[in-house]
């Protein structure tokens, strides 16, 4: 039998249920997105061989990790053989190793060539040099990259228009932190020791992990530029302090963003998410590595081999010497051979 006592308690039950429903989601913590540990900025730093001043307007999650770009190779320094001289050594540039890892394919020999950046070509006009060097990474990648600072400027204009000064302050701190990191990267990436200047062309075979093989060709000096020496030097004490200060600024600005309006928080969140999407697409569409005044690009199609020995024998025939292959452990030395690889 129905008890009217329960019917009288129905409004109280509904009110309790209404209180149990969570309140509408707020966007006060949108600035915390900037603290996500993403690697779009570090990869971009490696692909262009440093930083550009326009990077200060590229605000993406993980921007406080830019100084970790020298770890982009995941600790790999692959064995390399110079097929023209017989020397065996390692590629010491983490950015170059990262690029070679990205173009390498298991069981395939990928050929890449090092050439001078179009900005160094004095045979063409200054205007053509500027345009070619600007779009050396490819037109789609360049357009996607420029959309990042355009997005930042657009969001700042809107925040100023609606009078959300907390949001403007948060973005201003993001930009200030980026300025510090960009300046430090530019200081660390200045070209240093690359060995003695030599003439002639070089031909390198690089053995990467997971049975990925890359053949890198170009002039000897250009090959040294992208493989030898130190890319990012260690942080000095003032630089270390500056980077720490910039990192704390990013954390502080994420907290400061809590005071932004709902619209401002939404704009900041959309800016960070859209920018990291654009930069990730830009990185994936970038078809070359820029290192100092050189550009590394793939050449032709990858060649598939059933055995690594088959690949080694073919290259030995082309180079007309096997000391580099012996030094890399690709082939056994011939009986009675007096030629020995040179390890450097």
Can you say where each PLM-predicted feature lies in the sequence?
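Cytosolic/matrix-facing juxtamembrane and C-terminal tails of multi-pass cellular membrane proteins
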Residues: 192-237, 277-344
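Cytosolic-side membrane-insertion boundary helix
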Residues: 121-165, 231-238
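Hydrophobic alpha-helical membrane-embedded segments
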Residues: 158-197, 276-280
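Membrane-lumen (extracellular) interface motif
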Residues: 138-139, 149-174, 248-270
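Transmembrane helical hairpin unit
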Residues: 228-288
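Soluble extramembrane domains flanking the early transmembrane region of eukaryotic membrane proteins
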Residues: 1-145
């Amino acid at each position: 039998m129905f008890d009217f006592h329960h019917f009288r308690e129905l409004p109280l039950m509904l009110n309790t249920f209404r209180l149990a429903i969570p309140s509408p989601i707020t966007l006060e913590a949108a600035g915390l997105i900037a603290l996500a540990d993403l690697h779009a900025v570090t990869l971009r730093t490696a692909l262009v061989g440093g930083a550009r001043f326009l990077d200060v307007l590229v605000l993406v999650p993980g921007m406080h990790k830019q100084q970790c770009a020298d770890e982009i190779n995941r600790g790999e320094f692959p064995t390399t053989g110079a097929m023209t001289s017989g020397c065996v050594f390692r590629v010491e540039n983490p950015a170059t190793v990262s690029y070679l890892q990205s173009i390498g394919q298991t069981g395939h020999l990928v050929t890449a060539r090092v050439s001078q950046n179009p900005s160094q070509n004095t045979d063409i006009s200054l205007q053509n040099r500027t345009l070619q060097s600007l779009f050396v990474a490819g037109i789609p990648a360049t357009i996607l990259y420029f959309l990042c600072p355009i997005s930042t400027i657009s969001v700042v204009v809107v925040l100023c228009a609606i009078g959300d000064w907390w949001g403007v302050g948060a973005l201003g701190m993001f930009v200030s932190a980026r300025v510090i990191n960009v300046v430090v990267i530019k200081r660390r990436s200045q070209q240093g020791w690359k060995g003695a200047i030599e003439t002639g062309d070089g031909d390198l075979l690089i053995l990467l992990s997971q049975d990925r093989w890359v053949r890198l060709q170009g002039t000897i000096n250009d090959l040294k530029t992208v493989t030898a020496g130190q890319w990012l030097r260690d942080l000095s004490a003032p630089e270390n302090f500056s980077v720490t200060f910039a990192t704390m600024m990013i954390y502080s600005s994420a907290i400061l963003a809590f005071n932004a309006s709902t619209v401002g928080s939404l704009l900041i969140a959309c800016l960070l998410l859209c920018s990291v999407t654009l930069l990730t697409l830009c990185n994936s569409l970038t078809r070359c590595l820029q290192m100092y005044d050189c550009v590394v690009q793939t050449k032709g199609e990858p060649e598939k081999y059933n055995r690594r020995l088959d690949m080694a024998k073919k290259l030995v025939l082309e180079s007309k010497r096997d000391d580099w292959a012996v030094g890399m452990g690709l082939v056994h030395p011939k009986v009675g051979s007096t030629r020995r690889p040179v390890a450097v």
